[in-house]
């Protein structure tokens, strides 16, 4: 997104796909049916183009950097929809469900990054979808279950992280002290 004008940004697949999602009447119906609100909070590199995004849906908010605290948003959110963001690890650590919307999966791996050790379909913490229709279906499934994480996914998350508690700082401090002695 670096170096793009807003007009150029509005021509990108990224903008067109996410704009289509946040303005989709089906999303509004799902949110209303299950009693949820959504916050579209794009990556900080996209925040400068935030004025390009719009929605008429009262249950869909567009989150601006500085107006919404990311930590609070993560803590208060019941479901995360992301693409390839590392924020997924924070959300999974809280044992919350995720959906990966990877509409540009082939191009992402072909031009942006090399595939590393992490395979979203194997190692990820939620369903990978590549179409808007599949995304809306995954959202409905999650909302209908009150955003519950399946026992299988809970096991996967626990196996990935080992210890899930609020004592990480203490463990890190102790490990550093042991290394220094």
Please provide the spans of the model-predicted regions.
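Catalytic binding pocket for nucleotide-activated donors in carbohydrate/polymer assembly enzymes
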Residues: 52-57, 84-160
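C-terminal alpha-helical cap of glycosyltransferases
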Residues: 165-181
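Donor nucleotide-activated moiety binding/catalytic core segment of transferases
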Residues: 44-89
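Short beta-strand/turn micro-motifs composed of small residues
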Residues: 40-42, 82, 102
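Conserved catalytic-core segment of nucleotide-activated headgroup transferases in glycan assembly
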Residues: 1-52, 129, 164, 168
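A structural signal for isolated positions on well-ordered beta-strands in alpha/beta enzyme cores
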Residues: 37-39, 61, 99
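Acidic, amphipathic alpha-helical patches
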Residues: 27, 70, 125
């Amino acid at each position: 997104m670096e170096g793009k004008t807003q007009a150029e940004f509005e021509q990108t697949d990224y903008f067109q796909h996410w704009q289509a999602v946040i303005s989709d009447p089906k999303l509004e119906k799902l949110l209303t049916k299950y009693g949820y609100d959504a916050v579209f909070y794009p990556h900080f590199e996209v925040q400068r183009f935030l004025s390009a995004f719009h929605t008429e849906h009262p249950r869909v908010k567009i989150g601006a950097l500085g107006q919404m605290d990311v930590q609070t948003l993560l803590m208060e959110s019941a479901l995360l929809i992301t693409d390839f963001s590392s924020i997924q690890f924070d959300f999974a650590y809280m044992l919350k469900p995720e959906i990966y919307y990877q509409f540009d999966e082939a191009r992402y791996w072909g031009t942006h990054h090399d595939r590393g050790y992490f395979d979203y379909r194997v190692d990820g913490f939620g369903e990978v979808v590549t179409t808007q229709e599949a995304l809306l279906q995954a959202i409905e499934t999650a909302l209908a279950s009150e955003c519950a994480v399946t026992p299988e996914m809970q096991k996967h998350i626990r196996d990935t992280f080992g210890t899930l508690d609020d004592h990480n700082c203490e463990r890190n401090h102790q490990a550093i002290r042991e290394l220094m002695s």
